[in-house]
Structures are given as structure tokens and as C-alpha cells.
């Protein structure tokens, strides 16, 4: 069975989409190829790396990437994680489904916000897996 492709997108591919890629690979990896990208590339936020490390997921080797049109066009599902990405998502081919899962941006906020958003993303991906 070929794996489906899920592509997580946020503004800077720095926090939310990086954490979603980490959780996605752990939770969905048997059935899905998991990628992330951004409208811009801001670099991976060190606090996002630390937040995921706290739950045993290493995203320290991830890079912050702009949206890759090839991955985008070959995805089965594109998930936008913030309103900016939702509003500025490139046009998708008709065969690519899109969903919006909005999460607060933890960048520049207290550590507890990174933990909260990390856990909310995990819950959303676990919920997605069971539907």
C-alpha cells in the first residue's frame, strides 16, 4: 500500500508546522508521508525543538522550508495551521484536499505556550488518525 501524503503549512515553518511534522511522523508515519512548509522560512524555533524533545521527539534536524510546489501538488491532504497560511495557501489541484486546523502562534510567548500548542497539535493529529 502506498502511503498518503500530508503537508502541514504555517507562516514561517518555524513552530507549529514543525511540531505537527514531528507528531505526524510519530503518530501517522505508518500510513502517511509527513512534510511541513511555510509561506516564509523563518528558521526552526529552538523552543519548538525543546518542546518536542520534552516528549521524546527529535526535530533538531528539521529545516525551515518554503512551501514546495511538488509536495503540495502531490499531497493527499494539506493542513493549514494558522489563518495567514489558510488565507495565503497556494491554489491546490482539485485532487488535493485542504483542512484548516488553527493553533495560536507560541513564538515570543512563555514556555508554557509552546507546551500547550504542542499538546493541542498532538490531540488534533490523534483525532485525525481515528476518523
Swiss-Prot record:
GO cellular component, one term: cytoplasm
Gene Ontology molecular function: arsenate reductase (thioredoxin) activity; protein tyrosine phosphatase activity
Catalytic activity: arsenate + [thioredoxin]-dithiol + H(+) = arsenite + [thioredoxin]-disulfide + H2O
Group of enzyme by EC: oxidoreductase
Pfam families on file: LMWPc (PF01451)
Keyword Glycoprotein: no
Keyword Oxidoreductase set for record: yes
Gene Ontology biological process: response to arsenic-containing substance
Protein name stated in the entry: Arsenate reductase 2
Native source species: Staphylococcus haemolyticus (strain JCSC1435)
Organism classification: Bacteria, Bacillati, Bacillota, Bacilli, Bacillales
Underlying gene: arsC2
Amino acid at each position: 500500500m502506498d502511503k498518503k501524503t500530508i503537508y502541514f503549512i504555517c507562516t514561517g515553518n518555524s513552530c507549529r508546522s514543525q511540531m505537527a511534522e514531528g507528531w505526524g511522523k510519530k503518530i501517522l508515519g505508518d500510513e502517511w508521508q509527513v512534510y511541513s512548509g511555510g509561506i516564509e522560512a523563518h528558521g526552526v524555533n529552538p523552543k519548538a525543538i525543546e518542546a518536542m524533545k520534552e516528549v521524546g521527539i527529535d526535530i533538531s534536524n528539521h529545516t525551515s522550508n518554503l512551501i514546495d510546489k511538488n509536495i503540495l501538488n502531490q499531497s493527499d491532504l494539506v493542513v493549514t495551521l494558522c489563518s495567514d497560511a489558510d488565507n495565503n495557501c497556494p491554489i491546490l489541484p482539485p485532487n488535493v484536499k485542504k483542512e484548516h486546523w488553527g493553533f495560536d502562534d507560541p513564538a515570543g510567548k512563555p514556555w508554557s505556550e509552546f507546551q500547550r500548542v504542542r499538546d493541542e497539535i498532538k490531540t488534533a493529529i490523534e483525532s485525525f488518525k481515528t476518523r
